[in-house]
Amino acid sequence: MAERPEDLNLPNAVITRIIKEALPDGVNISKEARSAISRAASVFVLYATSCANNFAMKGKRKTLNASDVLSAMEEMEFQRFVTPLKEALEAYRREQKGKKEASEQKKKDKDKKDCEEQDKSREEEDEDEERLDEEEQNEEEEVDN
C-alpha cells in the first residue's frame, strides 16, 4: 500500500495526457513541471484516499465507496468539485447499467439462437429417422413382394 508520494507513481502517459487536455493548444510544459504535477497528483490521491478511508472507518467498513470520496472532497474543502463528480458518477453508473443490459440481452439472444439451433437439429434428426423408417418399411414391402 502506498503511504508516501514516492510510493505512488502515476503513469507518466496519463499525467501528460491530463496536462495536455487542461492546457490550451500550443502551450508546452517542461519535464520538471510535469514531474511536479505528477508528485502533486500523487499527494492529492493519497490525501483524498486517507480522508475517504476515515469516512469508511466511521461507517465500520473496510471498503471505500463513492459517498466516502464525495464526503472527503467536502471535508478537504473541494466542494466545487462535488457536483461535477456526482454527475460523472451518475454518467458512469448509467454507462455500466447500459453495458450490463446489453450483455444480458446478448446472452439472451445467444441462448435463444442456441435453443433454435437445437430445435432445428432435433427436427432434422426426427426427419432423418422418419426417412429411415420409411426406407426400411419400403425395403420390407419389397422383400415381401
UniProtKB/Swiss-Prot annotation:
Chain intervals with Acidic residues compositional bias: 124-145
Stretches assigned to coiled coil: 85-144
N-acetylalanine: residues bearing it: A2
Region of interest (Disordered), ranges: 93-145
Localization: Nucleus
GO cellular component: ATAC complex; CHRAC; epsilon DNA polymerase complex; pericentric heterochromatin
Residues recorded as bearing Phosphoserine in the entry: S121
Major localisation: nucleus
Compositional bias (Basic and acidic residues): 93-123
Gene3D superfamilies in UniProt: Histone, subunit A
GO BP terms in the entry: chromatin remodeling; DNA damage response; DNA-templated DNA replication; heterochromatin formation; leading strand elongation; negative regulation of transcription by RNA polymerase II; nucleosome assembly; regulation of DNA replication
Keywords recorded for this protein, A-Z: Acetylation, Coiled coil, DNA-binding, Nucleus, Phosphoprotein
Positions of post-translational Phosphothreonine modification: T83
GO molecular function, one term: protein heterodimerization activity
InterPro entries: CBFA_NFYB_domain, DNA_Pol-Epsilon_Subunit, Histone-fold
Function: Accessory component of the DNA polymerase epsilon complex. Participates in DNA repair and in chromosomal DNA replication. Forms a complex with CHRAC1 and binds naked DNA, which is then incorporated into chromatin, aided by the nucleosome-remodeling activity of ISWI/SNF2H and ACF1. Does not enhance nucleosome sliding activity of the ACF-5 ISWI chromatin remodeling complex.
Assembly information from the UniProt record: Component of the DNA polymerase epsilon complex consisting of four subunits: the catalytic subunit POLE and the accessory subunits POLE2, POLE3 and POLE4. Interaction with POLE4 is a prerequisite for further binding with POLE and POLE2. Heterodimer with CHRAC1; binds to DNA. Component of the CHRAC ISWI chromatin remodeling complex at least composed of SMARCA5/SNF2H, BAZ1A/ACF1, CHRAC1 and POLE3; the complex preferentially binds DNA through the CHRAC1-POLE3 heterodimer and possesses ATP-dependent nucleosome-remodeling activity.
Protein name in the entry: DNA polymerase epsilon subunit 3
Organism: Rattus norvegicus (Rat)
Lineage: Eukaryota, Metazoa, Chordata, Craniata, Vertebrata
Gene expressing this chain: Pole3
